Amino acid sequence: MDMSIRQALLKNFMGNSPDWYKLAIITFLIINPLIFFFVDPFIAGWLLVVEFIFTLAMALKCYPLQPGGLLAIEAVIIGMTTPKQIGHEIANNLEVILLLVFMVAGIYFMKQLLLFAFTKLLLSIRSKRLLSLAFCFASAFLSAFLDALTVIAVVISVSLGFYSIYHNFASNQADAELSNDGFIDSTEKKQTLEQFRAFLRSLMMHAGVGTALGGVMTMVGEPQNLIIAKHLEWDFVTFFIRMSPVTIPVFFAGLAVCYLVERFKLFGYGAELPELVRKVLTDYDKKNSEKRTQQEKAQLLIQALIGIWLIVALALHLAEVGIIGLSVIILATTFCGITEEHALGKAFEEALPFTALLTVFFSVVAVIIDQQLFGPIIQFVLQASESSQLSLFYLFNGLLSAISDNVFVGTVYISEALSALQEGLISQSQYEHIGVAINTGTNLPSVATPNGQAAFLFLLTSALSPLIRLSYGRMVMMALPYTIVMTLLGLLAVEFWLVPMTHWLYEIGLIAIP
């Protein structure tokens, strides 16, 4: 039956999103101006923030750029903020945009090396506990220097490749549909596949948490870290040292959790790699290694050298992060022979949707600033004692980051803390301590749900998740031991260790007195 133009417009609006979600967004767009003009701009502003967080929580139904962008456009039209204020926020955070555009694209051209490393890791370590620790540690180390999304994308590629190799073997089909187990006729092969799925689920979760453990440590580990570092005027090394009283204990606690859940087979962990699967994968890798050409070996060597350049350039702060990322693109493409525009364009596909979404974040931050929405919360926090302020900032950030995007939350709170400093409500020293509390608060508790960590959301929405039966609920359950330990230890560190350890770092001359 032919549909009318009205029906076609409604069908096209937000694509395949559920009808109730489309209706909710339309309702928001209708009531926001009414409340802004006829009730109270402050209430309307808070309603917009809640609605925006709701769109982030519904990321699996519809990417937040569309519904969040509509809300942001309307906010400008009705006068909640101005294009000038949004432009000011974007200009202040240009480094973050350059990080997402150039660094993520740069690492894309090093995927070949990362795939090689993770493949060798998986096949060379037979102990599941050691392998889990290795994946968690490797993901943490890489995420401290690279983008967490890229790291998890590489681990997904490795796992998806291995899954397809065994699935094709088990189904006796060279190009079998990966989601179809109907061709697997043997009960033993089906049981082996289920065990392999459980094995891959646990590895993916360890790697995902590893990106959070490493990502919190450095200014390039997560996008919000760079925003916080810019507000605090810290370079790469200073940021790492200032965060260390909280991040180092939490890192080792995270590794301990990784070992314990595997040792005692808790929360869905503990599945071993079946011997049959190991043999199939090892044979496949051996054939691939024998077929590797001298040209491909040279590409791996070049990528390893570029990796060393990346770490040195970041550690010595030789240029802005985005510029270093651009240098990686130029070096990797030049010496690996990638010169076609089409091939270059693929590298930017991963980051640009999130870059656009980040710009919408800045629009909502502009509304928060213009309408002074966080004034009462900040006043409440600043009325507490200095030590309690740190815990409150950590907890408020952690709570919001678990249900919303941590880039958005971190940006809002560090902006408010800077305003408090400029108004003379807090000292420079306290402002820096609050910066640590905000950074750790946005990064550590956010592993609780896929909404908080972009890497987790990327994993959940990947082609791998349905194949290994990794649902939203299962991710939350498997992340639970990490969430509890990392959140509580982070809170203890902020409350009891941060200030005395920072003073000790002053005394031994590792950081300068503000």
Curated annotation (Swiss-Prot):
NCBIfam families: NhaB, PRK09547.1. Its main location: membrane. It is a multi-pass membrane protein. Keywords: Antiport, Cell inner membrane, Cell membrane, Ion transport, Membrane, Sodium, Sodium transport, Transmembrane, Transmembrane helix, Transport. One of its GO terms (cellular component) is plasma membrane. GO terms for molecular function: sodium:proton antiporter activity. It comes from the Bacteria. Signal peptide: none annotated. Na(+)/H(+) antiporter that extrudes sodium in exchange for external protons. It catalyses: 2 Na(+)(in) + 3 H(+)(out) = 2 Na(+)(out) + 3 H(+)(in). PANTHER family: NA(+)_H(+) ANTIPORTER NHAB, TRANSPORTER ARSB-RELATED. The gene is nhaB. The chain crosses the membrane at residues 13-33, 34-54, 96-116, 136-156, 203-223, 236-256, 304-324, 349-369, 392-412, 448-468, 479-499. Belongs to the NhaB Na(+)/H(+) (TC 2.A.34) antiporter family. It is found in: Cell inner membrane. This is Na(+)/H(+) antiporter NhaB. It comes from Proteus mirabilis (strain HI4320).
